[in-house]
Amino acid sequence: MRTFIKSHRRSSSLEACPPKTTPKRNSTGSPTELQPPVFPPSAPRQSSSFESLQKLTSGKLFSTKLFKKSGAQKLPATPDLPAFPRGYDSRSPSCEWRALGTEVALEDIPAIKGTRTHEWGENSDVSNSVIVLNRNSISSDGSYVETRDEQSPWRLARRSLDSATQTLSSTEEYSGPEIRIRSSTPHKLREASDSFLKKRWNRQARIHSKADIAKLEGSFPMPVEAISPPFARRRSSERSQCLGASGTMEQQLNPVNPEKCSLYAACSERSQSLTKATHALVATASTEVGLQNNLNSASVELRDDLENERESLSEEDSGSSFSDDSSKFSFEVGGGINGRTSSVKYYSKPDPPMRNYIDDLFEDEDFDEDMNCYDDDQEYEEDTEHLFGASHVQLEHGYSMMHEVTDSDSEQETKSNISSVLSKGQNAIFPSSDGRFVLNSGDSNGGSNQENIGVKMLEKSISNIGLEDVEDVEDDSDGIIPTDTQEDIDSPVHSQPSHANFSHIKKYSDIFGISDSDEDTANNSSSQYPFEEGYYSSDEEPTLRAEPAANTEDGFTDALKASFKQDESSHSSTDSIDKTPTFALDTDGEYFPPTLTLNKKSEVDDLDVSEEAAPESISLSTSDLEQPADAKQDRANIISSSIMDYAIHEVATTESVESDENQTTCVPQTTRVPSKVTKYADLFNLSDENDEDGSDGEFLDDMGFNELESTPVESKKPNIPPRRLGNEYFGNFHSPVASSHNAPAVPRQHSPLSAKVILPATENTSIKSQYAVPRMGQSPLPPPARSQTLKFHDLHSSLDGEIRGTMSNLFFIDESEEDQYYQVQSKVDDDYLDEINNVPEDFNFSDNDSDTCSGKSPMFPTGLRNSFRKTRSFSEKPTGLAKEPTPTRYKLDIKNKTVTFFKNGLSRPLSEGSLHGQSIPSRAHVPPLSLRKAMSEGSLEQSAHSPLGYGSLAFGLNSLKSPEMSRTDAYGLSPIQEAISSGDASPKLVN
């Protein structure tokens, strides 16, 4: 009895039946209204619980009486029974409409209908996407369908209203806001079941699980396509059919009072505000419920308004679903009744904005490498002022105006720097436009043309200086020597040629077409300028040029001309030599060439000097100048002595050097050719003898002599005339001036890339340091390296003077030859890669594969060959297919037996392992105690016929092995055959 009471309480709490006083309060109702509904016999009768049914059928507790009281035929005769019998399924969503038949207030509607998708923008309020909160179980819908007649479509629609899945899935009939219209059942019975209805609605507000959805699809008689896809917009034709059917049905409804009309209006407003015009307009009632004609018209008007609003919203939604395209979120809703999905997808813009990378701005925008913005006009103006001394306004008329632009500031600064180191009346020598040198005294008003200036200035300088003042002049005179730096002094003053001669220059490319004849014509026609200064464009700068033959009629000797000219043919063959002569001042204010050094290995040989080298002498073209014969030798001595100021570096000799009165010339020494280097491998064959000339040693400060070197162009010329120190002449020269001392001949050395001019060494020679701080803010020259020439490349820089060693030691190596040399000497890396790729990834590399102890010991079952087979990658030829990394299955299931493979590497006889010597066990694997006991006994029979402990196997009759001297090529696995009904052959543990 107690068990029955407990089961009864449990079922009552779930059903939440109304109190028994409910029929008593309904005293005014008719007897038909008080009767509970009659359920069809299709619903099977069940006991209240499984526990009570099991105990009652056992015959212990009043089985006959209890079954008679709980029968279905006793329900009409019992007036005090609750409205809902125990056998009724309380989870049925629509039983209240048939059982109670009362009006349900708005409180009965569940408070939560669903959640909306997250959107923003102007059209966020018009979206109709709803995430459905469904029931916890679907079995009630199936039971309801089984207990009701399934022919009425209105009951399907009514069930879809009660079920959250069917309501929001838009069934075939309607998709508007729901409005429930109830029958005229007494109000008192409805109030009694309010708590029960709320409890039921709260239980229905659940989200379907996948099991419920699968159960619903299998048990629900209505096709799934009728309610899928959810949230789909209804077509106008379907709406018209639904509205027509609803109007026909509404005419059959029972009339109601005006109070119910107001309740209907309130219900419609409340439902519309809750659902945002997304639910269906459905009229549900039983056969006993009806409406008046005015209610029919009101409901039709309400449906029309809702339909019009729905169409307008759908048009706006179809036009632009989202006002803000920066980001869109969408809840992906599955087809059918699967409800919502947990996936949230983000849709970015279809065309993202173009991103500006900084690399794209370098070519088109005004940015330097430090990402600093600058102005093109400002930079162009600064560049023109730096190069031409004029703004870009003066250059607007074309490239032809560039030839007439002068740099007045540079001109004044240059003349002031030169005049500060020249004595009064001395002249400066500047290159002309064709590469020739003219004398300039710094006075721009001295004449009207180049010829008058050259003659007058030269006559003035010669007349003021006599032969007896040569010693004084030599200390103050300046030599014109090209240097290898452009920073020592300002660039020469630009010339102003005739504008008519360059009128054909219209564009930048015309500058490259200017020939020497055009420049000569321009120089001859420019008589209105006070003097001709060296003109050259930015891409062709003035160079020292040579004439094919010497001209002795102009008053200048070949020695003077040789000091300023170079062979034009040699100049054309050596284009890579720097062609820009600049002028640098020595510490004492003298011009000197930086490429002239002294050779410590030079030896003085008594060689005859002939005058045959005179045609090769480089002369200065001054054909327009005519001087008296008396001044020729004086002028020659002055200029020659000034040129040699740097050549001897102010060598003060205490012992006189005797020179022959006869004219001497240089006799070249035998050429010394180093070892030929033709390829990269020849560099390793060079010996120390080839590096003798370019060996690293000390500088001039540690030597008593210097070595004069000239460029490869100057190697074809004889030596430069020497300078007279005191009353003695030092060195050899070719000059018509008679000398009372004999000078030994100076040998010359030749190399493929350089030529050395060697002067004889003298005793007690002291070198005056030339590295003191120069005057007038001029930068000092780099220290001349011993036995070296300037590096041979296109861009000349001051760093070349500091490179030690001769050019004979520098070789231009082809990179392809160097790569080929190393490819022959070493193995290609691809060969190693091929070998590595042929080895499987899971191959067990041992530390020492040749170790017999680790390869054949029973403690290490992985040998040389077994370690490779253990990888399970391949046993024959490697394949390039991807394989699953699944481990090897050691059990094979057949129909009648199961074969299991066990590793027997540790089950070998002790004598077999002892034949190879004692092995050291690994740290990772320690044999069990039973195995160690068996090994310590050393019995061959025991180890061969009895199991050896953990992991060992029970040998069969055919699995016995005799002791062997070497390991077999087996995989380390032995089979065990197990019968279906016998477990005797299974492995056993030995204690």
Swiss-Prot record:
Subcellular location: Cytoplasm; Bud; Bud neck; Bud tip
Region annotated Disordered, chain positions: 1-51, 68-92, 165-192, 306-327, 516-546, 564-588, 603-631, 847-866
This protein's GO CC annotations: cellular bud neck; cellular bud tip; cytoplasm
Biased composition (Acidic residues): 605-614
Primary location: cytoplasm
Domain of life: Eukaryota
Compositional bias of kind Basic residues: 1-11
Record key words, sorted: Cytoplasm, Zinc
Protein family: Belongs to the ZRG8 family.
Function recorded in the entry: Involved in maintenance of polarized growth and daughter-cell-specific transcription.
Name of the protein in question: Zinc-regulated protein 8
Taxonomic lineage: Eukaryota, Fungi, Dikarya, Ascomycota, Saccharomycotina
Gene: ZRG8
